[in-house]
Amino acid sequence: MILRSLECRFLTIALCDAAEPWQLGSQDAATPMMQGIIDLHHDIFFFLILILVFVSRMLVRALWHFNEQTNPIPQRIVHGTTIEIIRTIFPSVIPLFIAIPSFALLYSMDGVLVDPAITIKAIGHQWYRSYEYSDYNSSDEQSLTFDSYTIPEDDPELGQSRLLEVDNRVVVPAKTHLRMIVTPADVLHSWAVPSSGVKCDAVPGRSNLTSISVQREGVYYGQCSEICGTNHAFTPIVVEAVTLKDYADWVSNQLILQTN
């Protein structure tokens, strides 16, 4: 019982960076972009609660006071200047309060870094992904590239998430501005990591750009968010954020393996 209690308490404070069964809320924010999305959701939800309370009160009050038992002869009110002004202005002001922070967040998300520290190209295939780190070239002037396949359902290791783990993760340094270039090799794909607040579609014939800056170390899981064929559900995305030193060591090892 004590171990079970400690386990539940640990799960309560542990960060959520992958989808969970019956999950209703968002995953924990790993980037300023995702934190902005969560904050905007909370702000809009506040206005929704106000509208719900106001409309419910008006509805209950109308049903309570204006019925056949309490008021057999209905009142005939055909005009009310004050209430008409209020019910016209009030619904117009609420969307304004919602639109201003929404557009501010939208334009900040749409902005692409002019001079990012690292550029990573994600190429969608049926049904795996290829990644290119064009900032690091090996001796034969080829970019650091590798393929990322999902680990089969019957071959996971202890601690790996079922149908969410891959053989080669996307390793990035934490607290570093990154630029993602997303494009497909065949059909429509998408590169989406909920904890990062990123969903960038891979449209045939186009290269879409998005920016990302992971603020804490960890492993973040995502999946393809556009129907891309039979194995659409089996193309996960795994991003591992590490320290800058560990990232440099990983790049060095990958370049050595690629040249051999």
From Swiss-Prot:
Ranges that cross the membrane: 36-56, 89-109
Residue sites binding Mg(2+) per the record = E226
A single Gene Ontology CC term:
mitochondrial inner membrane
GO BP field: ATP synthesis coupled electron transport
Topology relative to the membrane, per the entry? Multi-pass membrane protein
Query: Per its UniProt record, what Pfam families does this chain match?
Result: COX2 (PF00116), COX2_TM (PF02790)
Q: Which reaction does it catalyse?
A: 4 Fe(II)-[cytochrome c] + O2 + 8 H(+)(in) = 4 Fe(III)-[cytochrome c] + 2 H2O + 4 H(+)(out)
Would the keyword Nucleotide-binding turn up in this protein's UniProt record?
Answer: no
Q: How is the cofactor bound?
A: Binds a dinuclear copper A center per subunit.
For the Mitochondrial matrix compartment, the record's topological domain ranges are 57-88
Q: What is its main location?
A: mitochondrion
Regions of this protein lying in the Mitochondrial intermembrane compartment? 1-35, 110-260
Q: Where is Cu cation A2 bound in this sequence? A: C224, E226, C228, H232
Q: Where in the cell is it found?
A: Mitochondrion inner membrane
Q: Which UniProt keywords apply?
A: Copper, Electron transport, Magnesium, Membrane, Metal-binding, Mitochondrion, Mitochondrion inner membrane, Respiratory chain, Translocase, Transmembrane, Transmembrane helix, Transport
Q: Where on this chain does Cu cation A1 bind?
A: H189, C224, C228
What are its cofactors? Cu cation
Family that this chain belongs to: Belongs to the cytochrome c oxidase subunit 2 family.
PANTHER family from the entry?
CYTOCHROME C OXIDASE SUBUNIT 2, CYTOCHROME C OXIDASE, SUBUNIT II
Q: In UniProt terms, what function does this protein have?
A: Component of the cytochrome c oxidase, the last enzyme in the mitochondrial electron transport chain which drives oxidative phosphorylation. The respiratory chain contains 3 multisubunit complexes succinate dehydrogenase (complex II, CII), ubiquinol-cytochrome c oxidoreductase (cytochrome b-c1 complex, complex III, CIII) and cytochrome c oxidase (complex IV, CIV), that cooperate to transfer electrons derived from NADH and succinate to molecular oxygen, creating an electrochemical gradient over the inner membrane that drives transmembrane transport and the ATP synthase.
The protein, known as: Cytochrome c oxidase subunit 2
- From which source organism is this entry? Oryza sativa subsp. japonica (Rice)
